[in-house]
Amino acid sequence: MSDGFCGTHLQIMVRTRGLGCALGQVTGRGLGRGDRDDSDDAPQRRRPTASARRQQVTVTADHVDEPVIPAPDVQDDPMEAPAAVEDILADIPADAGTETVEDQHQGFLGCLSDPSVLTAYADHVACSVWTGEECPELKLSSHGRKVQSLGRPVPAIEGLIVGTGLSPLIACSVDTGDRGLLSAFVERWHRETSSFHLPMGELTITLDDASSLLHLPIIGDLHAFEPLHVDDAVQMLVDLLMVSPESARAETDQCRGPYVRLQWVRDIYQRRCQAGHWTAAARAYLLHLLGCTLFANKSATNVHVVYLEALRDLSMTERYAWGVAALVHMYDQLNDASMSHSRHLGGYITLLQCWIYKHFPSVAESTADQDYDEASPRACRWIATKKTVKSIRTPSYRERLDRLRISDVCWIPYGEHREVRDFHVRSCYFGLLRWGPVAVYYRPERVVRQFGYTQTIPAPPVDSWVSYDDIHDRWMHYKDYIVPAGEVCVVPGACSSDYIDWFFRISHPFMTPDHALDPMLHGHAPQSRVVP
């Protein structure tokens, strides 16, 4: 499989500011971001204006290679092309580096003392929880049962499906998402750092996690498809799924954009199988699979037609880094869901839930499959059905996370799986990752403990302007953008002596004030000593 990219030169500028509504939003369905008035109990910190968030930050020579991350705005679906396009901007968060000196020292009452890193904290769900506003559990877009109900592909197309590299997704989807567990982790996700903030520091879903849990490739091309007009979506359905123009138009009209219902795709798959149109049947099967897994959106019923583009030539589908696609879409959905006004979580729920099962065994009450085969994706190791997923509410999980210590985390969990899925150095690449018009920052420098190194204070995030071509070039030359190896951990989860104190200043290690007042829960609580 090639590490290179297709030669398409995209004249599209990517702005580092955040794509909340990204891939899965259905226009006109009320799923976009909305503004929310501050409550009377919220910390009295003025919310940054849109113009302030959009300011370009000068990148200094010291930070020219450092990535930066997203902060959202209400916008149209970037996957759907506007009527007239001159410059298409893909946004990612304007975060650290944009605060004034006064802002840096203002802080938030009782929790975040230095807001220079988590600049969107005032609009974050963690701020709402801290001030006593109980947020409802997120609605999940979990389609594991849809995948299982469709079943494995018919024998005539099984070879085509396996050849795309996507077949591991057929078997590893969980049936039931744990709303309480996932909501508790979303509360700790921050777009500025692309990581979860916990009492012992930061952790994130890495490229190695995507590779090990899903057995998807993390080496290959990043798909460079462009936003799609509805007319183009209709033509794509006609060409690739062999439907009539009238049927395609009726379906996109019903979905109010370049989308089709998952049920409609299942019906097309069955019809193409009956007619013996095997290539079209394989494309329909894969579109349904992608819509239920990697690209699950908050509509919970639709899939974007644009994903068919990667299935146009099935012999070339395997060249894409599908593990990157999973991570990009998951990060983007987490970025959106962690804002205080959000009520839904899209993305591949299996990836997030099984990542939690693997790294936090003391938090999640998971059920292991006794018949698990080590040759299968690691996500197949757990059984998550309505019977096995316990109805534990978010506050209980919040309490468990507030009590976590370094020793409670499984920092390097795939040792016994390396014979099946080897570690690739590309997992330590830092910078922007993209899939179509969606771009997110991948920041392994903040979580080097997950690679076996001692965590030190990372450089502050810096905002910058880059083009899609720049993302391609960096990814192609990934060896120039690998996080430097530091000191190897003697004890798993080790960090430098100044790291925890720094982290407690720039973050909110605890979600509730009661735990913040308990020094014995602090990861840097002093050891007892004999006083003479």
Regions found by a protein language model. Give the residues of each.
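Extended, charge-rich alpha-helical regions
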Residues: M1-L89, P93, V101, H105-F108, ...
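Long acidic/polar interaction regions in large eukaryotic complex-forming proteins
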Residues: V64, Q75-T100, L109, S113-W130, ...
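Amphipathic alpha-helical protein-interaction segments enriched in hydrophobic
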Residues: R343-W355, F430-L432
